[in-house]
Amino acid sequence: MKFAPLKPKFFIFFLGLFLSPFFLSAQGFESWKDLHIYYKKNNFDPSTITEEQLKYLPILSNLPPDFDELQDVKLKKKLFYLITLPIIHESNRLILEDREMGINIEKKFLRADLNENEINETVRLAVKYKLDYSTIDLRLFRDLKQRINIIPVSLALAQAIVESGWGQSRFALEGNALYGQWTTNEQK
């Protein structure tokens, strides 16, 4: 994360960059009621969730198809929180992997010990995080460290709430876009 305020367009892109690969498992939830039963059975509650429990929260492939039919606002917010929380944590975990890789490659760069794979990985990171990689130098590694950092959970959650209206927006329900991302490409 940049230490300067993120521009909204960049922030949405940044979250969208990590959001799509993490919808891994629908866990067979065909309705919000099934999801609610699962959360209740496993004692998943936003106000008391632990780091250990986070490991067992499913990462959904989409919102339950009837999520917009849920009328209880308090329950809707609770479910939305539990739906988005594992996505945010998994995204941050992968961002930290990229950051650590960049830092480790920088250490080898400082020792003038980069191999071809590390150069390719540096370029991959620069492309992924939209940085100029025409010259692999200290500036690039500084920019990588500045750009590649976790997104505070509260900020990512707030962004999902604002962009999707607690999962009620058309983009969220029809396009599975909790962060307002969209494309005109029919294949994506």
Residue ranges and their predicted role:
Residues F3-F11:
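Bacterial N-terminal signal peptides that target proteins for export
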Residues M1-A4, L17:
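Generic N-terminal simple sequence motifs
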Residues I12-P21:
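Bacterial N-terminal signal peptides
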Residues F22-L157, V162-K188:
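Catalytic cores of secreted/periplasmic lytic hydrolases that degrade extracellular macromolecules
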